[in-house]
């Protein structure tokens, strides 16, 4: 049998298996990404996925980028190994169209080419859960949320004094240490988390063994909280990420150079937030203030300096009446960025004052309606109004069967980098997205979503031969994204076996000119089988199939289109307690040593193994 035929045959077997005896009651999941307040995942019409700390540990994910690429509707491409430049596409849309948050603090870096977050620099050691809300969310969050929101929630302290320590070692001389210690009583909470992850790596550019491109990531997170009384509480949150990465640049002939032993970059990102909460009966007030400071320096044939600062303030008023909720929010954002290339500095900045109103109505015990409206007043761009209308219906005649739909509008303001390199005397304007999704799901067993999104006034770039730099501008025309997501989980609790799978098909991922976007796979299949014992041992096998995917080969003139897809990766996982409060995790990745290039010309991880010993107290 053809190997790809065998792999694709897993789709019907894993996606559509049903067994009425396999009904398992799961613990409720609480999220904050849908409307900025805590709620059950059942209390929103939005399409939400949650990756838990348990799943991260079981799969051995080292970064957020690695964790989300196994979610339906999301694809990720890496330009090399750990810490190398990474792009992620939610439903085919660009990285800068997804808002990334850490405990509510904005991580999107305005100094990047799209205003995107560096998911490759977000390690998983301190994560409690990752919330992913797909579809336009600008009617709540404003800019950079037209594809969705990824909110990373870090660990919270338990009662008394608790902590953990973990050490990792693996292929490519990868080593890591992470630790946390926390305290909690009736009034005070404190949690300090720190991690270091290093690797000697492999060549970012093919061939993989040309030389080593290393990476170092240092992360510290501090959370403090004080509860004055049952109604009033204050929280402080600080996060810092410092990285150093070696990469491969271009030679004198403008070709990728796998033997480049000079090009490197470092970054220093600091986020600080203060939150005050007041709650009495059915009313809650949230005050939020945060700052983000982003510094990046790239050293290759020239020196590039990137600087950005974000100041954000918000006030939320939440009113609960019965099973319904109304939220009135006010926001103020100040975004400022500088881009310097060989001593030539350019600037981009703007102010945004926003107001939004969100309502959830439980019409009866089976039908939920959610409406959002937001208005943003800019000092630099044309003001924007966005909205969302959603409905979800539970079918009592078939318990566990839910249908729903959402229609939304969204926008993405230019990043400070895009503003800095725009055409002279030309004012960029935000891109505008509108779209809808329709979904049906039956318990865990089957979840089907169809989506259709269109973006106008997208950003594009031309190369200026005089300055050897890109110029950003708005384009006329409409980009189109249509696709289907199918996912399923099937449990055999008596045997301790869990089957999971998801499949994504993109019908359209077209640019404004009708051509297809590069680096998006038309088909993606993720499948896994996991086995659990009563002694908390876990072992599993995981596979990912990437279908047709295209990229460009710039090694000759004119550049030509190349195929980079049609391959399957297999991974093995093992987790078990080895002593009291001590666990061992072993993860074997790409076990058949498949050679592939997610980004044409760049290498990918070969057969590799990693082990982690963790202790908690």
Predicted regions and their residues:
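Outer-membrane beta-barrel "beta-signal"
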Residues: 439-441, 605-617
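Periplasmic-side early beta-strands and strand-to-turn transitions of outer-membrane beta-barrels
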Residues: 139, 151, 158-160, 168, ...
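Short acidic/polar hinge/loop motifs at secondary-structure boundaries
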Residues: 106-134
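Structural signature of Gram-negative outer-membrane beta-barrels, strongest in the C-terminal barrel
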Residues: 227-231, 239, 323, 327, ...
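Gram-negative outer-membrane beta-barrel transporters
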Residues: 360-369, 475-555, 580-584, 592, ...
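Outer-membrane beta-barrel signature, preferentially recognizing the C-terminal barrel domain
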Residues: 23, 254-279, 306-309, 395-398, ...
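N-terminal periplasmic "start-of-domain" segments of outer-membrane beta-barrel proteins
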Residues: 28-57
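N-terminal periplasmic accessory domains that precede
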Residues: 64-67, 86-89, 98-101, 117-122, ...
């Amino acid at each position: 049998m053809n190997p790809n035929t065998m792999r694709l045959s897993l789709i019907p077997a894993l996606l559509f298996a049903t067994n009425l005896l396999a009904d398992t009651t799961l613990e409720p999941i609480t999220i904050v990404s849908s409307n900025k307040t805590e709620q059950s995942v059942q209390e929103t019409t939005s399409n939400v996925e949650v990756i838990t700390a348990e799943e991260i540990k079981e799969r051995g994910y080292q970064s957020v980028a690695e964790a989300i690429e196994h979610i339906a509707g999301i694809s990720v491409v890496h330009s090399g190994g750990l810490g190398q430049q990474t792009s992620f596409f939610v439903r085919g849309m660009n990285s800068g169209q997804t808002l990334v948050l850490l405990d509510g603090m904005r991580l999107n870096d305005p100094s990047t080419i799209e205003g995107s977050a560096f998911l490759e620099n977000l390690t998983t050691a301190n994560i409690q859960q990752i919330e992913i809300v797909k579809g336009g969310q600008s009617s709540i969050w404003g800019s950079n949320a037209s594809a969705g929101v990824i909110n990373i929630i870090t660990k919270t302290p338990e009662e008394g004094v608790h902590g953990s320590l973990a050490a990792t070692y693996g292929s490519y001389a990868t080593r890591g240490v992470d630790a946390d210690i926390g305290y909690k009583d009736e009034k005070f909470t404190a949690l300090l988390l720190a991690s270091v992850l290093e690797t000697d790596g492999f060549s970012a550019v093919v061939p993989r063994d040309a030389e080593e491109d290393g990476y170092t990531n240092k992360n510290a997170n501090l959370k403090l909280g004080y509860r004055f009384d049952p109604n009033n509480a204050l929280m402080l949150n600080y996060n810092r990420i410092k990285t150093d990465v070696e990469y491969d640049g271009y030679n004198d002939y403008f070709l990728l150079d796998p033997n480049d032993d000079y090009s490197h970059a470092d970054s220093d990102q600091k986020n600080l937030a203060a939150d005050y909460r007041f709650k009495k009966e059915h009313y809650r007030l949230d005050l939020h203030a945060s700052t983000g400071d982003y510094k990046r320096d790239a050293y290759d044939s020239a020196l590039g300096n990137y600087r950005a600062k974000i100041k954000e303030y918000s006030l939320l008023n939440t009113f609960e009446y019965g099973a319904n909720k109304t939220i009135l929010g006010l926001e103020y954002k100040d975004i400022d960025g500088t881009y310097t290339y060989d001593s030539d500095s350019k600037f981009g900045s703007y102010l945004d004052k926003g107001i939004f109103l969100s309502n959830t109505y439980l019409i009866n015990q089976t039908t939920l309606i959610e409406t959002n409206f937001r208005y943003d007043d800019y000092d630099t761009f044309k003001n924007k109004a966005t909205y969302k209308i959603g409905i979800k219906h539970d079918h009592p005649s078939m318990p566990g069967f839910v249908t729903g739909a959402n229609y939304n509008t969204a926008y993405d303001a230019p990043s400070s980098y895009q503003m800095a390199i725009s055409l002279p005397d030309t004012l960029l304007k935000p891109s505008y997205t509108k779209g809808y999704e329709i979904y049906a799901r039956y318990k865990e067993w089957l979840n089907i979503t169809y989506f259709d999104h269109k973006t106008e006034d997208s950003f594009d770039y031309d190369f200026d031969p005089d300055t050897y730099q890109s110029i950003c501008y708005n384009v006329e025309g409409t980009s189109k994204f249509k696709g289907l997501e199918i996912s399923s989980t099937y449990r055999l609790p008596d045997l301790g076996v869990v089957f999971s799978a998801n499949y994504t098909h993109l019908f359209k991922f077209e640019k404004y000119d009708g051509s297809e976007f590069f680096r998006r796979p038309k088909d993606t299949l993720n499948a896994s089988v996991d086995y659990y014992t009563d002694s908390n041992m876990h072992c599993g096998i995981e596979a990912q199939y990437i279908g047709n995917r295209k990229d460009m080969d710039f090694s000759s003139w004119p550049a030509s289109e190349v195929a980079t897809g049609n391959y399957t990766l297999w991974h093995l996982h093992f987790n078990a307690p080895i002593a009291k409060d001590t666990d061992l995790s072993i993860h074997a990745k790409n076990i058949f040593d498949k050679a592939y290039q997610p980004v044409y010309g760049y290498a990918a991880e070969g057969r590799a193994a990693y082990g982690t010993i963790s202790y908690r107290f």
